[in-house]
Amino acid sequence: YKRMKEGDKNALVDTTANFQKLIDINARHDEVRDVINGRVQDKKVIIELQDVFYVQYLSLDSLRSGKVQYYNRHIMDYNQAHNYNPAITLCNKDLVYPADFAESYVEELTGRIMQTGDADAYLIRGSIYLNQKEYAKAIEDLSAILEKEPDNLLALFNLANARMLMFDYIESVDDKIPRIVGEQQQMQRKIDYSQVIEGYNECLRIDSDFVFALFNMANVYAKNGEIEKAIETFNQVLRLDKDIAEAYFNRGLLYIYTGQKALANADLSKAGELGIVSAYNVIKRYCKEN
């Protein structure tokens, strides 16, 4: 086990195999790792779950050009209250900022924080740190907001995301550390996602319709091997918003895992219709009846 101290709890780093049919559950071969962190993999092809959503800084130019993945009431309220300066968005792909932008903007935000302890500056700086994969700094900034505003939904959401992504990053680094020749294979390790789930539940306490907290929670369940919980949570996502392409895609992968090819085909087809073109390749490869 590799231990990592985060707050007053320890997180245990995990590499859990998830997907039957395509792989041998819990198999951990040195030549080909079958599944790591929610990825469906055979000997040649890796299919990853669509990633979690998190709050990211969005430039006004990007906003004007329509580079917004999904609209959300909390995001719109924040942007309108701040006259879109700054503006934020919910996205499950890392936005790419111009060269040197992040560093210079972080310096500006740091100055504001030192002068006033501005919660908005903490939120934007923490979100940029999260985008730049500086997870510990992101956690520190978002926690600072919650000390004063415990019901700040956007800070709660990104704090849960930062913890989850940090746990997964540490797992990926640990998994790549070469073993000494002759060393026995390491025991299966499991991440403690309890703080992450708790954070998403806090978001849902504030707004039970906050679909992105449900989506991210479903992804955590899938990574943790709780497949039925993950499917049911994706069901909740799609009951709230039937146009979340990523939920259809991820639920479709889980249906493949459970051997329900017809349901997988339907979900992946819908994901393709909604813009995830790679879903069609998954259908061709895994949804054909034998």
Model-derived regions, located:
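Short coil/linker segments at helix-helix boundaries
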Residues: 5-52, 56-62, 66-93, 164-199
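Canonical tetratricopeptide repeat
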Residues: 124, 158, 216, 250, ...
